Amino acid sequence: MMVLKVEELVTGKKSSNGETGEFLPDDFRDGQYEAAVTSEKQEDLKTLPAHHVSLAEQQWEREKQLEAELKKKKLEQRSKLENLEDLEIIIQLKKRKKYRKTKVPVAKEPEPEIITEPVDVPRFLKAALENKLAVVEKFLSDQNNPDVCDEYKRTALHRACLEGHLAIVEKLMEAGAQIEFRDMLESTAIHWACRGGNLEVLKLLLNKGAKISARDKLLSTALHVAVRTGHYECAEHLIACEADLNAKDREGDTPLHDAVRLNRYKMIRLLIMYGADLTIKNSAGKTPMDLVLNWQNGTKAIFDSLKENSYKTSRIATF
C-alpha cells in the first residue's frame, strides 16, 4: 500500500519517487490544497462561536414549524362550506359551543318562611301590601277577621288588589273577605284593582261577583278610575264586561270627558270605538268635543302669547 508523507499531503508536491503525485487533483497541486484547507479552517473557526446561538435558533424554527403544522391541521379539520347543509351544520355547532360556554345561574328557591308567633293587625296589613303570603296565612289560620282595616278603612284586600298580589287576593277571598267592603272614600276592591292596573286581579274580582257598576264617593265607576290612571287593558276588559261607557261622576264627567281632559289618546280611541257618546254634557255644560276645542284654544293662546312676547323682545333689542 502506498504511504503518503505529511509534507506531500499538505503541500501537494510530488515525492521523489513519483508515486504519490497522482493522489491529488490537478487543482490542488503546487500548494493550492494547503491554502484551501487553511481558508476552510479559518471560516470554520469564524462560525464556531455562533454555533451555540444557532442551536437555539434551530429549536425556535422547529417549534415555529410545528406550530404552523398544527394550525394547518386544524384548518383542514374545519367544516368546509360547500352548500347550505354545511352552513346549517356550522351554525348548529356554533350554537352548541355558545350554549356550553354560557353558564345558566341556578336560582335558589327561597326557604319557606315559618311563622310561629301570633300576627297582629298592622303586620297583617303590611304583609298584604308586601306580598308576604306566609304572614297572611298565619293571621287567617288564627281565625282572625280578614276585613280588619286601617284608619282609612282600607282592608288587606284593598292593598293586595292595588299591588296586584293575586295569591294573597285569592287567599283573602277564600277566608271570606268582603269584595264590596268600602274604604273612607267608598272605593271597593274593584276600584283599587283598576287603580293598580293588574288585569288578572280585576278578572278574579269580576268572576267572584264584584259589582262592575260600583261607585265611590265621587260617583266614579271602575271604568272612570281605569281611564284616569291610564290602564288600557283594565279599561278594555271592563268595556267587554259591559261597563257603562257614559256613566257620569259627581261633576257630570263621563270616562270620555276624563280621557280628553288627560289627553289619553288610546283611551279616547277605545271609548269612541265602543260607542261612547260625544254629545253628553257635564255639569259645566261641556261635551268631550268642547273640551278638545278648549284645549286647542288654550294651547293656541299660549303660543300666541309666546309669539307676542318674542316679538316685543326683538323690537326692544333693535333699539
Swiss-Prot record:
Query: Induction of this protein: by what?
Result: Down-regulated by doxorubicin (adriamycin), in vitro.
Query: Mind telling me which Pfam families this protein's record contains?
Result: Ank_2
Keywords assigned by UniProt?
A: ANK repeat, Coiled coil, Nucleus, Repeat
Q: Which organism is it from?
A: Oryctolagus cuniculus
- Give me any GO biological process, just one: regulation of transcription by RNA polymerase II
Quaternary structure and partners: Interacts with TTN/titin and YBX1.
Q: What is this protein called?
A: Ankyrin repeat domain-containing protein 1
Each ANK repeat, start to end: 152-181, 185-214, 218-247, 251-280, 284-315
Q: Name the PROSITE patterns for this protein.
A: ANK_REP_REGION, ANK_REPEAT
